[in-house]
Amino acid sequence: MAERKGEIIRKTNETSVSVRVDIDGTGKSKISTGVGFFDHMLDQLSRHSLIDMDIEVQGDLHIDDHHTVEDTGIAIGQAIAKALGDRRGITRYASLDLAMDETMTKAAVDISGRPFLVWNVNFSAPKIGTFDTELVREFFQALAQNAGITLHILNHYGANNHHIAETCFKAVARVLRTATEIDPRQAGRVPSTKGMLA
């Protein structure tokens, strides 16, 4: 099987982002965005998806974290799309309820080629430490749009905002792990009656 790796370098007046992913990795990561909480979340995304990720970001953090988070999501999504290629042989669909202490979050994905995010997650505070909670949605919107996936994220319940955010990243990681796996019964076919995913 061909290597499923993708690399994206994205430079704008706001950020400089370098992302390398290996879909068939072991969950190793090297992450530096300048935003501590975000680094922690991306480490969870890599570890639990088993997608190796090497992410280096320099952003306009003197303004806020928004551009850094959004542009990182864009680049990760593009790198995943590049690594998956025409998506032959993949499982395509996955869904999961993930528990962490008092919190339960559901994620479902269709690696469809049709980007869409359904987001039903509410935080009880605007920040986790210094990190804006609204940026969690911004990240997943950018990821879904640029990876070409349909992604649903639903928080059933939870009291701790850190746990709510973390279960979003871990649940998405786990469904990406399953949906990107090669299904040997597909025998290299594109998993769609249309013959393509778009």
Curated annotation (Swiss-Prot):
UniProt keyword annotations, A-Z: Amino-acid biosynthesis, Cytoplasm, Histidine biosynthesis, Lyase
Tell me, which GO biological process terms does this entry list?
L-histidine biosynthetic process
Q: Tell me where on the tree of life, at the top rank, the source sits.
A: Bacteria
InterPro entries for this protein = IGPD_sf, ImidazoleglycerolP_deHydtase, ImidazoleglycerP_deHydtase_CS, Ribosomal_Su5_D2-typ_SF
* SUPFAM superfamilies, per database record: Ribosomal protein S5 domain 2-like (SSF54211)
Q: Which family does it belong to?
A: Belongs to the imidazoleglycerol-phosphate dehydratase family.
Protein name per UniProt: Imidazoleglycerol-phosphate dehydratase
Specify the species: Agrobacterium fabrum (strain C58 / ATCC 33970) (Agrobacterium tumefaciens (strain C58))
Q: Which gene encodes it?
A: hisB
